């Protein structure tokens, strides 16, 4: 799952599903933080044409939907913006945000539909109109032979990654 969309206010979003907390075997470090940085850079490069002013860059969000708790703190959501280390009240205001959505979370306030989405991701439980729409769309896509084949291959890869992650 990798989705890039923009809303009516020209805010751009890159959403990606993460089923495994990968480490780089050479450095023994987790890849998700650097992947976030890379995706922010890709969004900016795509959104700003050569010669355009930097202040034309729209707000961007890189959102990882994780089926694991990257920080092991139990939050439903971890949101990051750039802040001054010497004075945490100062925000850089570059309008670049990274969010890690933790489908296994237990702490914090989230919208009911987001919680339903987490339940759907974790257990394929349809318990709201929102998750019913998602489930219906997936069912429809499975009917298309080409999409169905790609979906089955993706599901097999996700299953393999989940097994490796356990």
Language-model segments: what does each one mean?
Residues 1-97, 107-109, 160, 164:
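Accessory alpha/beta interaction modules
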Residues 52, 106, 123-127:
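Generic alpha-helical structural element
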Residues 64-67, 102-103, 142:
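Pocket-edge structural micro-motifs
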Residues 96-107, 116-121:
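C-terminal segments that line or cap access tunnels to active or ligand-binding sites in enzymes
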Residues 13-18, 112-166:
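Short, charged alpha-helical interaction segments and adjacent helix-coil junctions
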């Amino acid at each position: 799952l990798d989705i890039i969309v923009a809303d009516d206010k020209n805010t751009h979003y890159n959403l990606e599903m993460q089923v495994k907390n990968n480490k780089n075997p050479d450095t023994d470090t987790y890849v998700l933080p650097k992947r976030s940085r890379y995706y922010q850079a890709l969004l900016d490069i795509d959104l700003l044409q050569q010669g355009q002013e930097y202040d034309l860059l729209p707000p961007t969000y890189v959102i990882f939907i994780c089926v694991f708790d990257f920080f092991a703190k139990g939050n439903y959501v971890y949101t990051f913006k750039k802040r001054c280390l010497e004075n945490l009240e100062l925000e850089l205001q570059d309008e670049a945000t990274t969010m890690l959505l933790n489908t296994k979370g237990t702490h914090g306030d989230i919208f009911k539909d987001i919680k339903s989405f987490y339940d759907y991701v974790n257990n394929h439980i349809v318990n709201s109109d929102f998750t019913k729409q998602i489930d219906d769309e997936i069912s429809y896509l499975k009917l298309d032979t080409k999409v169905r084949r790609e979906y089955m291959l993706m599901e097999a890869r996700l299953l393999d990654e989940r097994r490796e992650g356990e």
